[in-house]
Amino acid sequence: MAKRIKDPGEKSRIRATIFDKLNRRGKWGPIHTSKENALKGIPSHDIGIAKDILEEAIKEGFLVPKHTGYGDHVSLNFKKNGEIMAIIASLLAG
């Protein structure tokens, strides 16, 4: 079970960090990476909530799931490019 977030901006920061990492690595559409790699670099005390945020992003359509023989992978959704870039820009602005 993930910890409860006291600061609502913390959830946005973690989401933007995940999206920024995938964007910088070019993980759009058919180019995917494992869920574990998407979460690398997140502080260990935030991993639980980051996993929940990753699952929420899949349900909301920001991330596209890809089931492979060696685990579940994700990539950024081209159709939500504008929204994803706005979320990343909010991270860089703050």
Language-model segment annotations:
Residues M1-R24:
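Short alpha-helical segments that sit at the start of domains
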Residues D7, K11, I31, D46:
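Residue-level marker of regulatory loop/turn positions in helix-turn-helix DNA-binding domains and
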Residues W28-I42:
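Short acidic, hydrophobic short linear motifs in intrinsically disordered regions
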Residues P43-K59:
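Short amphipathic alpha-helical interaction segments
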Residues D52-L54, P65, V74:
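Charged interaction/catalytic cores of defense and host-pathogen modules
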Residues I58-T68:
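A short, conserved structural fragment
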Residues Y70-L76:
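Minor-groove-contacting beta-hairpin "wing" of winged helix-turn-helix DNA-binding domains
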Residues K79-G94:
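Short, amphipathic alpha-helical interaction segments positioned at domain boundaries
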